[in-house]
Amino acid sequence: MDERIRAAALEYHRTPKPGKIAVTPTKALTNQADLSLAYSPGVAAACDEIVRDPATAALYTSRANLVAVITNGTAVLGLGNIGPLAGKPVMEGKGVLFKIFADIDVYDLNIRQLDPDKVIELSLIHISRSLAST
């Protein structure tokens, strides 16, 4: 890689705030009333509705617009087996593409697990209920 591009890429990833993605609230939280609706006791109303009808999770949570970009770092975008932590910038980059081009929110998950069956189990069985279309 050209040294100028390398330096510019490192600066891009480092400043003004490290990384390329962030979690931002979709609701106001500016006073005690907002806090009571967002958390306790108001959040219980949304929980009760989801218990009554799980399909309402799409109405009361961000789940319908949330996906995960998951890697264990063994085959990262032309870089090979670089591990989950070194693969994080690539996963964040994929998250940016989802957000900018499709307005889909993304969590990047970088898993320290080499067994593909366990990665799939974690992804599809243990965390998938937090994500869209599961």
What positions do the PLM features span?
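Conserved small/polar residues in nucleotide/adenosyl-binding loops
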Residues: I125-A132
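Gly-rich Lys/Arg/Thr-decorated short loops/hinges at beta-loop-alpha junctions or inter-strand turns
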Residues: T30-N31, T71-N81, F98-L109
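N-terminal small/polar loop signature for handling phosphorylated ligands or for N-terminal nucleophile
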Residues: K118-L124
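An N-cap/entry alpha-helix motif that binds or orients negatively charged groups
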Residues: T15-L59
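Glycine- and acidic-residue-enriched helix-capping/strand-helix junction motifs
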Residues: L77-M91
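Short beta->alpha junction loops
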Residues: L109-P116
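Solvent-exposed alpha-helices and their adjacent loops that cap or buttress functional pockets
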Residues: A57-R63, A68-I70, K99-I100
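Ser/Thr/Pro-rich, acidic low-complexity intrinsically disordered regulatory segments
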Residues: D2-E11
